[in-house]
Regions:
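Non-transmembrane, aqueous-exposed alpha-helical and coiled segments at domain scale
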Residues: 1-173
Length: 173
């Protein structure tokens, strides 16, 4: 969803987490959440945006990262942004809910000490992808994953609010 991409030239002391938490709500539902956020940090403005786009092509592995725990500052940052963006309650299609992002991907690059370029690109269904190889031996046979392949998911729904979309009022939005 490049039309919802964001770029900021932050000061070196500015918090990337704070910027993301301030910026994500301004993107509305046009990026089709839940999805991923690709974040590029460093280089120039152009490089930060390229890093953000490249980051979106990485494999979704947040469940694995949460299970094993962070092993670097970058993984700690990914988890912090993931948890805090989901805590915003934006939810699927911006209608409220527990899951706004499925993963956070970050790539960084050295930059001038006087600035901190940060680019953020959200993905939508158009950028979700699968990897496969065509070897010329015949028709591609892509097998859908089994339900057992998906992780078991549980959450506390006590703070959730059920919304009747057929009868929602402006005040309830």
């Amino acid at each position: 969803s490049e039309n919802k991409s964001k770029l900021a030239m932050l000061n070196p002391s500015d918090s990337i987490v704070d910027w993301v938490l301030k910026t994500v709500p301004t993107m509305g539902a046009g990026w089709c959440p839940p999805g991923m956020l690709g974040i590029g940090i460093g280089g120039t403005a152009e490089k930060a945006m390229m890093l953000a786009k490249e980051a979106l092509m990485e494999e979704i592995n947040m469940d694995e990262l949460l299970r094993r725990g962070p092993q670097s500052k970058m993984e700690e940052l990914r988890i912090e942004i993931f948890e805090k963006v989901n805590a915003l309650g934006i939810g699927a299609q911006g209608l409220g809910g527990l899951t706004t992002v499925l993963d956070i991907k970050i790539k960084d690059y050295p930059c001038h000490a006087a600035g901190k370029p940060v680019g953020m690109i959200p993905n939508c269904a158009a950028t979700r992808h699968a990897h496969f190889t065509l070897d010329g031996s015949g028709v591609a046979n892509i097998i859908a994953p089994k339900l057992e392949d998906y992780p078991e998911v549980t959450w506390d729904s006590s703070s959730s609010k059920r919304v009747d979309l057929d009868n929602i009022t402006q005040e309830e939005m």
